[in-house]
């Protein structure tokens, strides 16, 4: 099958970015290429055209490949709801919530849909570039594996192992991986690469040769650190943790324990008129914030309790009294109302939780999950916007008479009588340039001519150039069989 797989020596070694760059490089060679990740764990999901969901990293990789995101690109998606359990999405559809022990028992049965999705992609494209998850060196997870070597062997896909020199110990990472995995798994590895190098690459020549000598694997190159990665949609909430910008308007967002779809913040952190700050657990909401954003969450009632435990409810009321603005998105919108009821226990124990009371609305959870892309207009400015909805629950109440937007001919969201508190189910809306500019002007912020989508395209091209300059891309792609 025409495929090659990038696995890593650990999490956050840059696998997702490498696959995105390789997809763009292959596309520029005239190949029909598609990304594929057998199993992902993320609360940052993208909605596909057919109403399914996949990891947002695979959506970015699809964009790099010039494709619409498809559920086959990420057939198994785990969305953590607690420390013990995750919602399981198979081929875009929710199949239930499993505790960790139950997941390990069920995992082997999911190889069939994984191979089914992979087969459809390989039949439709010249090349499929596969991304592993975590590391194959986690040999305690090898039994029933569908994400790394279990998949590679089942699908007969050659593997290139990526190590991360930025965190140190890359020689031990790569040589150690070979030492702990089964010989049959090691035989699937065709080579390695070193990612995130800082400084003069020539200084690592000896270490590079040592890895080749110790493993017998071919090296495909050393990739210098790519700072423009910060301009691409964040895959992990920690990527947004560093304050960005030096603008006059401070935008503070609350780092919930189950934060989801935080890519809403990506366009904002690139606006020069803003300073975007993550409020971490235990920290107060900064008094200088002009806007506080309550982002999405995988557990609205759970994170509402988490919010109160940090004292953020008191901070939000003080912020509102000072004349500050508040925006709730999806789960954050639900929190702003009077109550959040979950009679069927879809996100935890059945029951109801008192909301923050900043909007006169109530939310009731129900099992029908809304997954859809939308286009509409922002009511206050009249500017067009687009985005997506991905939520359970319906929200209603008097403040819905002041909708945030109109989408597909219906009102969406809610606003307080004073206009300073708004809520919406729409993710991704800040990628709409005209709307974003109008919204920020309403806050008194200096706006820019940022064309967000065009910038993402430019960075993907630069990423492909970067890999072409430092990797044997032709040799790596030639591994596909």
Curated annotation (Swiss-Prot):
One of its GO terms (molecular function) is catalytic activity. Residues 248-435 form the GATase cobBQ-type domain. GO terms for biological process: cobalamin biosynthetic process. Catalyzes amidations at positions B, D, E, and G on adenosylcobyrinic A,C-diamide. NH(2) groups are provided by glutamine, and one molecule of ATP is hydrogenolyzed for each amidation. Gene3D superfamilies: 3.40.50.880, P-loop containing nucleotide triphosphate hydrolases. It comes from the Bacteria. Belongs to the CobB/CobQ family. CobQ subfamily. The active site is at residues 330, 427. CDD domains: CobQ_N (cd05389), GATase1_CobQ (cd01750). Pathway: Cofactor biosynthesis; adenosylcobalamin biosynthesis. This is Cobyric acid synthase. PANTHER family: COBYRIC ACID SYNTHASE (PTHR21343:SF1), DETHIOBIOTIN SYNTHETASE (PTHR21343). InterPro entries: Class_I_gatase-like, CobQ/CobB/MinD/ParA_Nub-bd_dom, CobQ_GATase1, CobQ_N, CobQ_synth, GATase_3, P-loop_NTPase. Keywords: Cobalamin biosynthesis, Glutamine amidotransferase. It holds the Pfam family CbiA. It comes from Cereibacter sphaeroides (strain ATCC 17025 / ATH 2.4.3).
């Amino acid at each position: 099958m025409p495929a090659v797989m990038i696995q890593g020596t650990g999490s956050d070694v840059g696998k997702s970015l490498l696959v995105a760059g390789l997809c763009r490089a292959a596309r520029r060679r005239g190949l029909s290429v598609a990304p594929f990740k057998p199993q992902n764990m993320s609360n940052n999901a993208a909605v596909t055209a057919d109403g399914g969901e996949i990891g947002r990293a695979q959506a970015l990789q699809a964009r790099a490949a010039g494709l619409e995101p498809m559920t086959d690109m990420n057939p198994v998606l785990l969305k953590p709801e607690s420390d013990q359990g995750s919602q399981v999405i198979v081929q875009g559809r929710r199949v239930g919530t499993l505790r960790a022990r139950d997941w390990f028992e069920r995992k082997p049965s999911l190889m069939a849909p994984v191979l089914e999705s992979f087969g459809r992609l390989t039949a439709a494209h010249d090349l499929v570039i596969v991304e592993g998850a975590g590391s194959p060196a986690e040999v305690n997870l090898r039994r029933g594996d569908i994400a790394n070597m279990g998949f590679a062997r089942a699908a007969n896909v050659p593997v290139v192992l990526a190590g991360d020199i930025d965190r140190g110990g890359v020689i031990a990472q790569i040589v150690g991986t070979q030492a702990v995995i089964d010989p049959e798994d090691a035989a699937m590895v065709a080579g390695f690469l070193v990612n995130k190098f800082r400084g003069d690459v020539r200084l690592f020549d000896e270490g590079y040769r040592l890895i080749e000598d110790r493993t017998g694997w071919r090296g495909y190159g050393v990739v210098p650190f790519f700072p423009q990665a910060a301009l691409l949609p964040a895959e992990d909430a920690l990527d947004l943790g560093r304050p960005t910008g030096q603008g006059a308007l401070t935008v503070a967002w609350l780092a919930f324990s189950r934060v989801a779809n935080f890519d809403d913040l990506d366009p904002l952190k690139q606006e020069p008129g803003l300073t975007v700050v993550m409020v971490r657990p235990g920290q107060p909401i900064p008094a200088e914030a002009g806007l506080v954003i309550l982002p999405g969450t995988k557990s609205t009632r759970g994170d509402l309790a988490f919010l109160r435990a940090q004292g953020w409810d008191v901070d939000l009321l003080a912020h509102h009294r000072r004349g500050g603005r508040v925006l709730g998105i999806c789960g954050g919108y639900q929190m702003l109302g009077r109550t959040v009821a979950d009679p069927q226990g879809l996100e935890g124990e059945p029951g109801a939780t008192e909301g923050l009371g900043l909007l006169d609305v109530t939310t009731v959870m129900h099992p029908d999950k809304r997954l859809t892309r939308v286009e509409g207009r922002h009511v206050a400015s009249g500017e067009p916007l687009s985005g997506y909805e991905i939520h359970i629950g319906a929200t209603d109440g008097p403040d819905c008479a002041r909708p945030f937007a109109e989408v597909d001919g219906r009102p969406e969201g809610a606003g307080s009588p004073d206009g300073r508190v708004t809520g919406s189910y729409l993710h991704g809306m800040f990628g709409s340039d005209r709307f974003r500019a109008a919204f920020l002007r309403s806050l008194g912020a200096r706006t820019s001519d940022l064309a967000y989508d065009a910038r993402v395209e430019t960075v993907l091209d630069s990423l492909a150039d970067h890999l072409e300059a430092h990797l044997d891309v032709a040799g790596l792609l030639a591994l596909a069989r």
